[in-house]
Every structure is written in C-alpha cells, then in structure tokens.
Amino acid sequence: MKTDIEIAQSIELKPIVDVVEKLGISYDDLELYGKYKAKLSFDKIRAVESNPVGKLILVTAINPTPAGEGKSTLTIGLADALNKIGKKTMIAIREPSLGPVMGIKGGAAGGGYAQVLPMEDINLHFTGDMHAITTANNALSALIDNHLHQGNELGIDQRRILWKRVVDLNDRALRHVTVGLGGPLNGIPREDGFDITVASEIMAILCLATDIEDLKRRLANIVIGYRYDRTPVSVGDLQVEGALALILKDAIKPNLVQTIYGTPAFVHGGPFANIAHGCNSVLATTTALHLADYTVTEAGFGADLGAEKFLDIKTPNLPTSPDAVVIVATLRALKMNGGVAKDALTEENVEAVRAGFANLKRHVENIRKFGIPAVVAINEFVSDTEAEIAVLKELCASIDVPVELASVWADGAEGGVALAETVVKTIAENPANYKRLYDNDLSVQEKIEKIVTEIYRGSKVNFEKKAQTQIAQIVQNGWDKLPICMAKTQYSFSDNPNALGAPENFEITIRELVPKLGAGFIVALTGDVMTMPGLPKRPAALNMDVESDGTVLGLF
C-alpha cells in the first residue's frame, strides 16, 4: 500500500488558478506562490462579503489516541464527497506546525486519498506564514529588551515580563533560558523562555483578526508584562503595533490550495487546541462561507477542547454558527477509552467498544448543549471488525445520533458519500439553534466552572494561590468579561491524561491564568500542559530525507 507522500506525489495537480475558477476567483484576485499555491487578495475578500452565507460544518472528534483519529483526513474527505454529490463545497483548515511534523506526526495535511496538496510544501514552509508569525513575535521580544537597555522609560519590571520568544520546533531545551548575558553592552540580564510558534498570542490574533486595522488593534492590546507598580504594559505602550502588523501584512491573507479531487481549500493559521483556541483563521472561514454553499472546517483534538473553543470563542466572530457538527470516532480510540492497552488496539474487543462509547456519548451530549445537531463519523481502519462496527452503530442508535462509516483514507471521495448525504439530510431536517455555553458577564471562576462541570463533567474546580492572585488582578484591570480558553490535556475530559473514557467526580486544578487581550480571551492553565513541546525518543525526522532531484521522502 502506498504511503501518504507516495499518493500525494502520484497526483497531477491542477494550476490553482483553474481550481478556484469555479468559485468566481480570477487570476487577478490571487497572489501566486508558484503554480499550486496562492493567497487571496483583500480586494476579493471584501468583494464577496455581500454574497449569501453558506452552510457551515464543523468536524471534531472524541478524545484521541496519541496517533490522532484522522480528523483532518475526514474533513478533507467529507468536503470531496460533498462536491461529488453536487454540493459546491470548500475546506477551511489549519496549517501544520513544523514541530509536530518533525516530532510525532510526520505530516498533517490529511492522509491517503483525502489530502490537501502540495502536501510537502504545506507541511514544511508553505507560504511563509509561520516564519512571519515567528518573526513578529521575536521582533517584539527584541523591542522589549531594547527598551530595557535604552533606559526603560515605561518602568517595565523585567521580573514580570510575560512575553516569550518562539520557534516553530519542538525544543524542550529552550523552555527556560537567560538572555542579556555578557556585560552592559549586551542588554539587561533576565530570565526568558521559548514557546512553540503556534502557542504565540500573535498566532491566535492572526486567526481572529478580520482585517489589517483589526490586526493592529489586537496587536496593540497584547499585555507584554507589568511595571514596577504592577500596572500592565501593552504593545500599544511600546508603540510598535504598526511594525508588527507590517511583518504580518501578507500572512493575514488566506492561503488557497487543492485536495486530491480538486476541492478548493483554505489552509490558514494553526493554533494548538490544547494550549490555544485550535481553529483556523476567521478570515479564511468567513470567506469560504461567502464563496461556497458548504464549508467544512475542523477544530483541534477532541470536542472538549477544539469544538468548545470554536463554539465559545471563534463562532461569535463568524457570520454564522455551525449547522452541524461531525464527531470523528475510531474503534481503536473507543477501545483505548474503554481500557485497552495501546499495543492491543488492533485486536477485536466488542466489550471495550461498549465501555469506550461513554466517551463518544458525552461528546454528543456536549455538542447538543450548544443547540447544534451531531453526526458520528466512524473513520474506518483495516483492523475494524464487523462485530465492533455493528455494536457502535447500535449504541449510536440508542442515543438517536446519526452514524456513518467513512473510508476516505482508502477510497477518497467515494468513501465519504454516505456521510456527506447524512450530513446534508441532518442539516435540512434539524435546523441548528446555536447558543453559547456561558455568558461573558459571568465571573472568571463561574465561566471556568461552567466549562469544567458541563463539558468535562468534573465536580469541582480548585484554584491555586497563584491563580487566585491573578484572578484578582484580572478583575482589577477590567479583563474579567473575556471568554476562557482552557489549556488542558487532549487525552482526557479531566486534567489527568491517564483518566480515559468518561471520568466523573474529578476535580480540576487551575494553576495559572494568562490574559491574552490581543486574542480576546484568558488562558486557564491546568495540569502539566507545555507551551513548548519536546521531541519523542524516535522523532519522525529520522525517517525524512530529500533526493538529489528534490523528491521528498518520509512525510507520511
């Protein structure tokens, strides 16, 4: 069987100009990056704003195994299948981060016959957006340190600087560093650290900004630290939002590529869902809604993380809310949530499927709390058995949720037709009545408790002393009406990655609260969530190479 990269390299790509012609996009509307990649101009984005708004389909998943459950693959395959049954459809997904590509994932542009192309470019440097975000972030760090060196007119307390440097790699050695060493000519010594680029607030801002002016406004609002008198210091105080926006002036424009089947796709922005809000850009999603009758998008990790943030943080910034949510489930993930060890997930175990169904059931219930109909997609694997599939279908019927098998990895668009038809039927017969989980006017504690008790089903929230102090500071500064972005393990409803399935009566501890005023939310950190990942014992990078003719090897 061919690998993902071999399948991708066997496809004859169409020029991107031809792919997007059916959407009413012309050559003059594009800023080309070679023949197969382009950015859409702001003139065209503004021109389509008066178009009708299409249907929005959000793809999410149950709590995943470390290998992931094929959510991006299902998103791409579903869009291809919708086009196959005659629905004018676009995709709006995130750009992969190079860190996980070189680490555990080895690629994140779909898989099999449900991929966005050119996958090598998308997984590596693409159109340079990640570089621009990294540069803007680190330019701000350099400007902060220069301000300290040049006399510190703003009275910034170097012990209370929140802003970190970033790099788009998994590099645990950079989590804690000291900068400014080497004497008076080299700056003011202070403790610093690096996050991965996709954890930068600038990434979140890029994904929520609606235009250049909104981008500048959000950049100006970033809190970079505190003065000696404990008052906040912003980018606006440094007067450098214009310079940062200049670095990002092209990165804010959505990127256009294609699937194996020629479906147009926006691939733009890529914040993680366990440490950020986990959704592609508002600009890309909104523009897709104005260009197509159906837009298929995704939110990172399980529905407890990505989907909750999509619905509570991103949706209020969109012209519409999701008309349906597709929850991707795999039998291997259900079995893992049912107590099966990782090395036994390919063995038939009907009882483990029954036990693990509690996890899927909770995600379905949670989506319904937002007033949106859910559809379950079983992402098929060769190890799945007829008995396991039959039990899962029976269990889905018991909670009255539509369920379809999807084999888009192996069969492409054809393998998603049944799912596409079910989603279209669900949207037609069950109109969504979207409502947010909480009102922003609730206190910080109440909003967190709402997420923990209603989505995670925990019994109590504990706030460490540091978090309590930060809440008081947030209230004092008038930031307490912002939504909450939970930073939590993706493997469990709880903050314990080993508590699989559908745990109950657990307590969640909030250890820190970080205001992200530019993004417009407050991050609540739980457990041991890292904003700079490390590499595994055997990184995917060990399998990667490039041949003398430029052929890429090892991206899978």
Curated annotation (Swiss-Prot):
Per its UniProt entry, what is the enzyme's top EC class, as one word? ligase
Classification via Pfam families: FTHFS
Q: Name one GO biological process term.
A: tetrahydrofolate interconversion
Keywords assigned: ATP-binding, Ligase, Nucleotide-binding, One-carbon metabolism
Q: Which SUPFAM superfamilies match?
A: P-loop containing nucleoside triphosphate hydrolases (SSF52540)
| Involved pathway(s) | One-carbon metabolism; tetrahydrofolate interconversion
Give its E.C. classification number: 6.3.4.3
A molecular function annotated in GO for this UniProt entry is: ATP binding
Q: What family does this belong to?
A: Belongs to the formate--tetrahydrofolate ligase family.
Q: Which NCBIfam families match?
A: PRK13505.1
This chain belongs to which protein, by name? Answer: Formate--tetrahydrofolate ligase
Q: Which gene is annotated as encoding this protein in its UniProt record?
A: fhs
